[in-house]
Structure formats: C-alpha cells, structure tokens
Amino acid sequence: MKQNSLNGWFKSGAPGVWISGGAVSIAVIMTIGLLAVIAVRGLGHFWPADLIQANYTVPGQENHIVIGEVVQKEEVPRERLKSAGLPVPDQGPEFMTRELIKVGNRDLNGNDFTWIVGEWLKDQATPANLMTIERREWGNFYGTLVNVKQDGKVIAEGEAAWPELQARVERVNKLAAQLKNLEKTDIGAINSGLERIRLHGRKLELEGKLDATAQADMDSGRAELNNRYKDIEARLSDLHAQFNRDSLTARDGNGKELEISIGKVVHAYQPNAMGTLTKVGFYFSKVWEFLSDDPREANTEGGIFPAIFGTVMMTLIMAMIVTPFGVLAAVYLREYAKQNLLTRIIRIAVNNLAGVPAIVYGVFGLGFFVYVLGGSVDRLFFAEALPAPTFGTPGLLWASLTLALLAVPVVIVATEEGLARIPRTVREGSLALGATKAETLWKIVLPMASPAMMTGMILAVARAAGEVAPLMLVGVVKLAPSLPLDGNYPYLHLDQKIMHLGFHIYDVGFQSPNVEAARPLVYATALLLVLVIATLNLSAVWIRNHLREKYKALDS
C-alpha cells in the first residue's frame, strides 16, 4: 500500500514541483544574500564612525597614543602573531585579538591603516573633541583642533574655534564649486572655441583657401576668446587667493601639530559629539556626494558621477544601435529569407556568437572599429586634426558599437521567437483585406512582436552593461577629464573616452595603492552598478508590459 502511495506521489509530479520550488528558493536566497553583503559592506562606508583614543604599548617599546576608527576585529592564534615578529609572551591564551585601525594622517605616518594587538590597548576612550578632517589630498586627518587662522593670524581658538572652522569650511566648499564651474565650463568653452578655430584654419590651409580675409576672421575670433580668457583668469586668481586664505592648526594623538589649509578640507566633523539624527543627515549627504561628485586620490575617495554617466550613456547608445539592427536581421530571417540550409547555418552562427568570449569582441573592436574604420573616418573627415587621431582612437562610439556587436545575437533570437509566435491567420487576414506584405509587417506583425523586441533589448542591456574586458580596449579609462555630453559643440562627443562602473570596480579593487581604503568603495560601486542595470531593465520591462497589454486582443 505504501509502495502504491509512493508511486502515485511520484506520478503526480509533486517531487518535481518541490525540487523546482526549492531551487527557486535557493536562487532567491543567494541573490538576496549577495545583495545584502554588498549593501552592508558598501553603504556602511559613509556612516560617520566614532573615533577611539587609547594608549598603545608594545612590550619593550615606548607608549604612544592611537586615534582612529576601528575597522575590523579578528581573533588570531598567538603563534601567528609571534611568527610575524611581535613580542608576544610565551605564556597566555591561545588566541589574541587583532584590530585594524584607520589612523589616517598619511602625511605624518605614511599609512592610513595599521594592525594592532587589542590586548595592548589601554585606557580606551571616545572624547567628544576628537575630529575627522576629510581632505582633498592625503586622506583623513584625526586629532583635535587647536586654532583657526586667516592670512596666518589666529582668529579663533579654544571652544570658539570649532564653529568658526565650520563656517570657513562651508565658505571654501562654495568657492570650490565656483572654481570648478569656471575651470570646466567657462575655460572649457574657450579652449573648445580656440581648438575649432585652429582646426578651421588647418582645413582651409589644406584646401588652399586660407586667404587674408579668412586669416583676419580667425585672428579676430582668437583675440576675442583670449580677452575672455584674461577676464576669467583674473577671476580665477582672485578666487584662488580667497580659497587659500584660511588655515587651521590641528594636533595628533602624540602632540604633533600640523597646519592644514582649509582650502584642502572637504568636511570637518566630530563624530563622537554627533547625535543619531545628525549622523543620519551626514550619512545621506555623503551618499549624495558619492553619487554626484568627481573621484579624488586615485579614485579611492570622492564620488563616481563620471562613471555613472559614462555607463548609462554607453548603454543607451548601445541599445539604440543594437535594437534596430537586431530587429532587421530577425525580420529578414523569419519573414523574407527562404528556410533552407543557408538560413539554418546563419541561425546556428548567430546562436554561437552569443558564446564568444567578450575579450574577443574587444580585440575585434580595437582592430576593426578603432584602427580601420576610425582611421578611415579621420582621413576622410578630420584630416585637419591629423596626426592627432579623432575617431582613430578608443572612444564612446567604438565602445558602444563593440558592445552592440556582442549583444546583437540576443536581440535577433528574442525577436525571431516573438515573430514565430504570431498566428499565421493574422498575417493571412491582413493580406486578405488588401494590405501588402510590407504594410502587414509594419502595421500588424511588428507591433505584436514589440514585447519580444523589448525582451531582446532587456537581455542585451543586461549582457552588455556589466562587461569590462572589451571596454578596456575600446574606450574606457581610469579617469576621464570631461563628460562626453556638455555645452560645447557638437555637444555629444562620441570620440571621447569615458569612465565605466565595471572598470571602476576593477581599477579601485585591484589597481589601488591603498587597498583598505578602496575596499568599501568597491562594494558601494558594485551595488550602484547593480542598481543602474536594474533601473534600465525595469524601465524596459514596464514598456514591454505596456505594449503586451496594448496588443493582447490581437494575439487572441
């Protein structure tokens, strides 16, 4: 009886349902766990951690004071510390505590982080007057504030120094924004104008049309731009003088004083004196700074806005290229091509293209798009700029085309499947009513297959947006000096190199000189890359569902 019940249970298909449900549950748990690890390790970086101050005494050495953030604690065998050369006594517990402390003050100590033995820390405290100074160079400074100076003269010290410092830092950050706007926008526009005049003159010279009138026009335009530059240079000089006017004197844990220009200070805060609400507000301001600012200190500090912008821009251009070409190829293969051996071979080749390693596409993009196609474009349309390449060098356009080539098989397959699902009776009914094949395709078939096209585009975005290997060859760099979209003609600069979130993760994680400082930024950037791809995909899913509902009646 039990055997019959067991056989009936297997025949009912219940085991398959349980196995499938378990597999889905495991996949969901793994995905949530992965995102949780990335989020916790990445987003925790922006929280203003409390500072500790303690006496650290290594046996047989002089005592010194340690100030910093506790980043990590771990239990390690005593023998491991002893083999590392630390003066650990022979007798004692088997395991000892080792702590990673972010001590900052790289210009004084040489290192941002240090490992210490927890048992050798004494008199640990969290004084409210300890401050963190986030600098534009040399990382964080940890210590106490002594005084604030203006033009070398002390204007505030003691308790009055802290509010004065906050006001001066806020003033300096406003000046920094003005300087950045002048240098990138105004001076950038002047440099762009001068370069256009130079190229125009070179073009006229190559064509033999450079006469006195043209030369006078160019000289007039160049003189006007140079006059504008002199005015801006005077404003810049004044702003730089104001920017470097103030300074502060800070003292580290061992009593050494250091004078720091407030122009180099991004934030100054006392985390031990901050309440929970104040920390929450500061946390969100740091997250926004991470999303909207430019990177600093070899990409280990600051923001990643250029990488976000470059990733989104490249993905959108790739989608605009791959979708029409993929759809056209699928329409031809399904609607017009004879279903013979050659067509089957083409389909097999398209399916196999989806399995080609991404780096192969990168090598092809570099060899064909950049050197052959880009070099030809330069010789035909940008001869005046030679020997400096315009499109004959890696850039945004070639990166987008390379990823489009990588993703086009996905769009072809998805669109073909959508076209195959459209009932034959729909086509025959349209033709019977007098429509031509082209009208049937344009008015009936393609609208009904549009959800499948969107599915192909979603898969293409998911495949291409996270690729790094080919982009290293065809247009992505560690640090891009300007964005590919700005206010200078022709506004969208397809020849410019870009930053990319995927490459940024690789660069920060594996090419950074300061590994401990870069580690949380790797997780934060990885989380952001997932969110960017998810946002692009969800937008496409919403459009696909809208189209599916719109043409649902025709399917039935």
Feature locations, PLM:
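Hydrophobic transmembrane alpha-helices
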Residues: A349-V356, F369, S400-V411, V461-A465, ...
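Membrane-interfacial helix termini and adjacent extracytoplasmic/periplasmic loops
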Residues: Y283-G302, A337, Y361-L405, G475-V477, ...
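Interhelical loop and adjacent transmembrane-helix boundary motif
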Residues: A298, G475-L527
